[in-house]
Amino acid sequence: MPHIALQTDVPGIRGLAMFRPETAKPLYDLAQVLQRGESPLSEAERELIAAYVSHLNDCMFCMNSHAAAAKCLYGSDKNIVDDALHDMQQSAVSDKLKALLHIAGRVQVLGSAVTQQDIDAAKNLGATDKEIHDTVLIAATFCMFNRYVDGMATMTPTEQNEYAAMGERMAKGYVPPTP
């Protein structure tokens, strides 16, 4: 049950967006730029980073919804998402993406936990400064989103088919709901 009077039938951040549309717009704009804007990282990779950080934060709504978006974007390679969330090191994601996910995991713990060694390892595997930048910003942003969603105890669906529908919508872009 949400900690404040939210529409109980609107899950996660969408319920919060409907409660405060004036704060929703800049948050959705940021998500749109990070997840769908220009980046050397694919949209699928960016959604996987969001899902991975949300998984580490134990934010079930964000993890499931962004994993669903990543699956839509990965298409026939969608199993890579569950594999990476289950055991990133043994998954079929590229070594470069594993290094970037490692950095995202460091950000999730504490921003200053990212070391020059982490950055050098990613660069040695081909990561660019922009890919590293985007990874850190996505990880930091989703830590905030996770804390916002869970800190307000928003409604979290338990049925995976609800997340599949969310993932399809999110794969097309981030548009705030209207009250």
Place the predicted regions along the sequence by residue:
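Hydrophobic alpha-helical segments
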Residues: 1-179
